[in-house]
A protein has these predicted regions:
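Residue-level signature of outer-membrane beta-barrel architecture
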Residues: 50-52, 86-88, 126, 140, ...
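Transmembrane beta-strand segments that form the barrel wall of outer-membrane beta-barrel proteins
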Residues: 25-35, 61-73, 96-105, 137-142
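Outer-membrane beta-barrel "beta-signal"
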Residues: 44-48, 126, 151-164
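Outer-membrane beta-barrel initiation region
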Residues: 21-56
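Short loop/turn motifs that connect adjacent beta-strands in outer-membrane beta-barrel proteins
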Residues: 19-23, 53-64, 89-95, 131
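Helix-adjacent hinge/juxtasegments
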Residues: 75-99
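Solvent-exposed loop/turn segments connecting transmembrane beta-strands
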Residues: 34-44, 70-81, 109-115, 145-153
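Cleavable N-terminal export/targeting peptides
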Residues: 1-23
């Protein structure tokens, strides 16, 4: 059932993407709950994120653009999110902080306290080839103490991004 939700999300993400605009897709994998104090909830995660580099807003604190994505873990936990990211460039190096609220379903994984969770992430990537980036991300997901519990999770991710 949870895998069906992810497939539906990915289908809708690809179906409603404008055909003529540039779209950046990020495929990633990593470790869910890297600081697993109880030693029972660490899992491998696999995800997809979409960013439209044409939809952006330049401000005095950076270039902001919307992101949408989701991941699933090998313990059937699912997180689907949409939010905003900023991008800062230093030559080939890209630094991308982001914030995204999302829907979390624990599956057989860690109970984060409620369905509404917030992800804050920092990604460092290198633009090796034209429109192709390889990166490392560190993220934290929690519910801001709005739930009955708020254990939070920290994740480490390796990503591959390509603009199509």
């Amino acid at each position: 059932m949870k895998l069906q939700k992810l497939y539906l999300f990915l289908f809708l993400l690809l179906f409603f993407t404008p055909v003529k605009s540039e779209n950046e897709y990020t495929f990633y994998s990593g470790i869910f709950d890297t600081i697993d104090k109880e030693k029972d909830d660490k899992a491998t995660l696999y995800g997809l994120e979409h960013n439209n580099p044409v939809l952006f807003k330049d401000t005095f604190i950076g270039r902001f653009s919307p992101i949408t994505g989701g991941f699933i873990t090998d313990k059937d936990s699912i997180f689907i999110y949409t939010g905003v990211q900023a991008q800062y460039e230093i030559g080939l190096l890209k630094i991308t902080p982001s914030f995204a609220p999302g829907y979390y379903e624990k599956g057989d994984g860690k109970d984060l306290g409620m369905a509404l969770e917030f992800q804050s992430k920092i990604k460092i990537s290198l633009d090796f080839f034209k429109d192709t980036k390889i990166g490392y991300s560190y993220s934290h997901i929690s519910n801001n103490d709005w739930g009955t519990i708020n254990p939070g999770v920290n994740n480490e991710i390796i990503s591959f991004s390509k603009i199509f």
